[in-house]
Amino acid sequence: TTPSVVQITKDEVKIGNAAKRAMVTNPKNTISFVKRLMGADFNDENVKKMQKLATYDIVNKSGKPYVKIDDKEYSPEQISSMIVGKMKKVAEDYVGEEIKDAVITVPAWFGDTARTATKTAGELAGLNVLRVINEPTSAALAANLMEDKKDKTVVVVDSGTGTVDVSVLELSDGMAEVLASNGDVYLGGKDYDDAIVKWVVDEFKKSDDVDLTKDNMAYARVVESAEKAKIELSSSSQTEINLPYISMKDGALLNLAMTLSRAKFESLVKNLNDRTVEKAKVAVEKAGKKYDDIDCILLVGGTTRIPSLQEALKKEFNKPLNQSVNPDEAVALGAAKQADILAGNSTGDLLLLDVTPLSLGI
């Protein structure tokens, strides 16, 4: 997958993994989580929170949040269009022809202004946006949950790098209605990484009396190793974190070598799992549904690979977890299926009606 990260310097623009790798050495020029600014007003509470957390400057331009890099100001749509443009090129390189049309997905809680801003980003990237659809609906389409046209109630838990979105869908005869949506734009895979980072930093401080947060390059290596450790612990009972020559003390080079067990990791992230489950519980309540009404829980986003999160969801809802589609690809695959239908290429007769009721409060 390609991280939604952009780094802008006077010499070049880096997008995706290249920007993510360069983030620690030049955080001021590196933009991430711009999705949180889409369609927002500068005085929104969410923007105020982003100003405190972002490594880059967010400024007021005509009542809207803009990203300021050096002496230039960029709208969220412009930054987002750079990411969309990169993906357009990746797709064109793969299929060997120009791509003009696209279906773009958004979180179910996105309001009209955020949806319009997303469509604008696609257009700035040179695309004709055929439709903007809800991410949980797209995931349900990818998982073939709508093909039999039977009535179903599905809870979609989408946990990505920086956000958790839980939606309750009612599927009926090719129609998908979002009954309720609930989430946290400040909870996701990065928080699981951060839990490991904190543990590593604390343990090293105890053993070697060196604070790795004071050294940007050392800290960047810890952050990178934490993400790898998290991924490995989804399939292994323990993992090794080895960072040779991580620091220096009294003229001697120091090595970092630690073993992190899955059990220890689970204890570090229990509160994150609990918060995600709570978001799902509230979504079901808002939808006016009982647990017995739920047919399955569809897992979307890389963070849902974490075994302890899966167990927490199973324990709470006692419902089957649908993992039939790669969680990193589910939303994109559903969008591709919808695009195929709209282009008239699909042999199926599914016409997706994606409904977001006003009762969602967006």
Language model features with spans:
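Oxyanion-binding/catalytic loops of NTP- or PPi-dependent enzymes
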Residues: 1-63, 68-82, 89-362
